[in-house]
A protein has these predicted regions:
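Positively charged n-region of N-terminal signal peptides that target proteins for export
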Residues: 1-4
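Hydrophobic h-region of N-terminal signal peptides that target proteins for export
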Residues: 10-18
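Right-handed parallel beta-helix/beta-solenoid
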Residues: 17-47, 64
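N-terminal extracellular ligand-recognition/capping segment immediately after the signal peptide
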Residues: 46-49, 54-92
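Short glycine/acidic-rich loop motifs that flank beta-strands on beta-rich extracellular proteins
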Residues: 69-71, 92, 106-107, 112-116, ...
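Right-handed parallel beta-helix/beta-spiral solenoid domain characteristic of secreted/periplasmic
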Residues: 80-162, 168, 172
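Right-handed parallel beta-helix
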Residues: 84, 133-146, 163-172, 193-207, ...
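Acidic, glycine- and Ser/Thr-rich low-complexity intrinsically disordered tracts
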Residues: 91-100, 302-439
Length: 439
């Protein structure tokens, strides 16, 4: 009986692979009752996701795509691919010209449902986990800046379009607090086997980790993406498999800039990328800079379960360090010039060669928002404590309790919204390093 069930499952998988379909969606020209062809596209991505099967590919024309009932997120519960950047009639594809965008609005933050990310990848647990998957997400723009809430005046440097990002439940002049969610999230419980790829995408203004991916077995590839102005971490991959090496992560030719700390105290997290235990990681030809704490964090997980290669990357102006590792009981901060000597052969890092600082800052002339950059480089956090010396504190001190007082804190900026148009200019900033122009 078990053999029959296994054969049936394998047969079903092969049939899906053979009969994989292409579905076309256009927010501007499509209709719900259309067939989903180039000539008669569907209107909404969420509707297409309900109709497709494992192995299918959804092609998205330009436009801003809302979730079901404008809920700001999409459930991806099948092993499908989503390709964006098409003209409305699907006659041409250019992701930077024909922008396929996920740009939720703050006014819809009350319609979150249970999605932890704008894209929440969570396979149907009532069915066998998909095997041999090859999911591709290509040419998509994720910008959560319009769903956040910013202080109207505090932490607003000259020339920067918003004040500082506000941690919920605080809010500025918006209907709801900030959307503290991932841009892409894959659930820990997922047991899919195969490959998943993100390429030619922009991940911008996240109120949490931009891409937080859990994978069970296979290859995770992130290539030619821009991660800009996100909180906590630009990208990390976790293995939900107890066996080391079952998950491989290739992080190649990405640009990761302006990664903020977890809170406005600027002291916790703020990693461009993070490598973790049980994952074989390759970091190659990336640009990683302007992180609040460190460009590359390697303190998560058991070093003995890691196999990491970091080669040909460019690190610059990371405020705390270019990399950090755990040397119990301390965290060691390492500058890029010392990677080969201090990191290679230690901490699960097999290769750490040809990584350099930014030789020519002119590469970013006209590519980076100068007001935002100047404010970030000048940023500081300060606090002033003022204790009440009255009878209450005298009594508390006498019985060994801490005194109470007030703390006034000030930060020059924190997670302020970065302009979309400037973020798109980061594609192609440096030949051969970081995200290249999309062809």
């Amino acid at each position: 009986m078990k053999k029959m069930m296994l054969a049936a499952a394998l047969a079903a998988t092969s049939v899906l692979a053979v009969s994989a379909a292409d579905v076309y969606v256009s927010i501007s020209t499509g209709k719900k009752k259309n067939a989903g062809t180039k000539e008669a596209p569907l209107k909404n991505l969420w509707h297409a996701l309900q109709k497709v099967e494992n192995g299918d590919t959804i092609h998205l024309a330009e436009g801003i795509y809302p979730g079901n009932a404008k809920c700001n997120w999409f459930l991806i519960d099948k092993a499908v691919s989503i390709i964006g950047g098409y003209s409305p009639d699907f006659s041409a594809r250019n992701p930077l010209k024909h922008r396929t965008m996920f740009q939720p609005l703050n006014e819809n933050n009350d319609k979150k449902g249970n999605g932890l990310g704008i894209f929440t990848i969570q396979f149907d647990m009532s069915k066998p986990a998909p095997k041999g998957v090859n999911m591709v997400f290509d040419g998509l723009i994720f910008d959560d800046g319009q769903a956040q809430s910013y202080h109207p005046v505090k932490g607003k440097p000259e020339g920067v379009e918003t004040g500082m990002w506000l941690e919920p439940p605080a809010k500025g002049n918006t209907q709801f607090p900030s959307a503290k969610r991932y841009l892409v999230y894959s659930a820990t419980a997922n047991r899919a086997e195969g490959d998943i790829t993100f390429k030619n995408c922009l991940f911008l203004n996240a109120g949490n980790i931009a891409v937080n991916l859990n994978w069970y077995k296979g290859k995770v590839k992130m290539e030619n993406n821009v991660f800009c102005n996100n909180l906590m971490v630009g990208a990390n991959v976790y293995s939900s498999n107890p066996k080391p090496g079952e998950v491989e992560w290739e992080f190649e030719k990405n640009t990761v800039l302006f990664t903020w700390s977890r809170t406005s105290e600027l002291s916790d997290m703020g990693f461009g990328v993070r490598t973790t235990g049980n994952v074989k990681s390759e970091l190659e030809d990336n640009i990683i800079g302007l992180s609040v704490l460190t460009g590359w964090d390697n303190t998560k997980g058991n070093d003995k379960t890691k196999k990491i290669e970091a080669e040909g990357n460019v690190f610059f102006l990371n405020r705390g360090s270019d990399a950090q590792v755990t040397k119990s009981p301390s965290v060691v901060k390492v500058a890029v010039d010392d990677f080969e000597d201090d990191l290679e052969g230690n901490y699960g890092i097999e290769k750490a060669s040809e990584n350099v600082g930014l030789a020519d800052p002119k590469a970013f002339n006209g590519r980076i928002n100068t007001a935002f950059l100047n404010a970030f480089l000048s940023m500081k956090y300060s606090e002033k404590a003022s204790l009440d010396a009255g009878k209450l504190n005298a009594f508390r001190q006498a019985v060994g309790l801490p005194q109470q007082g007030t703390i006034v804190s000030k930060v020059d900026m924190f997670g302020n919204r970065y302009p979309l148009e400037d973020a798109l200019k980061l594609f192609g900033a440096m030949a051969g390093k970081g995200a290249q122009e999309i062809k």
